[in-house]
Amino acid sequence: MSRKLRIAGVAGLPLVATLLVAAPTVAASATPVPFFVSISGVGGFATPSSVYFQGSGIALVMGKVTDAGTATDFTPATTCSAGGINNLHTELLTAADGSTLTIVSHDVACWVSATRIYCAHCPYSIDTGTGRFANATGTGELNGYLELANGTFAGTYSGTISF
């Protein structure tokens, strides 16, 4: 090896050491990116005090997803003109590679007809994740409905995610 190459190699060691030390810091402080999910499927009352959701859809950063959700802990909502339900709404989104995100919303779902309940501008947070989303965090807004007449639901989540 020539003397110039040896000197260049030694001179580059501090740079390599700096990059190796900084890399975990950069990965741990992920920048929030847009997060959007559109899901739909079947749903209805599982018991008088719980609702289920089961479906699929598409999500930015996740791709195609399957969805399993519940709404529980019902109490009457006084903020809806036609009545509504305060509830704990949880959705488990599973990506094709098996990675998951659990989204939680303490929301108010308002009756908009005798058979349709709607959640508009309901805040959510990303509670947990697995696989490539193991350390994910994020927040945003849920908009969705459950139509009891035909047992269907549809919803969107829009916000940000860091992982």
Q: Each PLM stretch: what is its role?
A:
Residues 2-27:
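Secretory targeting and sorting signals
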Residues 27-163:
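Beta-strand-enriched cores of mature, soluble protein domains
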